[in-house]
Amino acid sequence: MPVTNMSALANGHLEGAAHGASVSLIFDHSEPGQGPRLHRHPYDETWVVLEGDLTFQLHDDRLRVGPGDIVIAPAQAPHKFTNDGRARANLLCIHASPTFRTEWLE
């Protein structure tokens, strides 16, 4: 069973294909006011909010989330999030793909 320490990951990204896995992970650390631009993937993406307060946009819906919340974006759903809290937000992003594939929409 392969083991990878998070400190060895480039920018917190673990692409599953390089480790024989069918999923890829991002350990995201967003400072207040930060987050990715609107984008989508050809596979589902799931986030586990570990710390922080964020607003997710999924299609035209906006969702306020915090620690312990899990957000799921289906394949092809446009989405983004913003850390609108006062402290760093920490999330685990699970991509249902052995490689990252992103279409940036803005």
Language model feature labels by segment:
Residues 67, 82-83, 103-104:
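Short glycine-/acidic-enriched loop or helix-start segments at secondary-structure transitions
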Residues 1-23, 27, 37, 103-106:
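A short, N-terminal "cap"/entry segment at the start of jelly-roll beta-barrel domains
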Residues 29-30, 40-56, 94:
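Short, conserved beta-strand element in jelly-roll/cupin
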Residues 60-75:
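Short acidic-glycine-tyrosine-enriched beta hairpin
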Residues 20-23, 30-34, 51-53, 62, ...:
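Short, charged/polar surface micro-motifs in flexible loops or helix N-caps
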Residues 46, 53-55, 62, 78, ...:
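Structural motif
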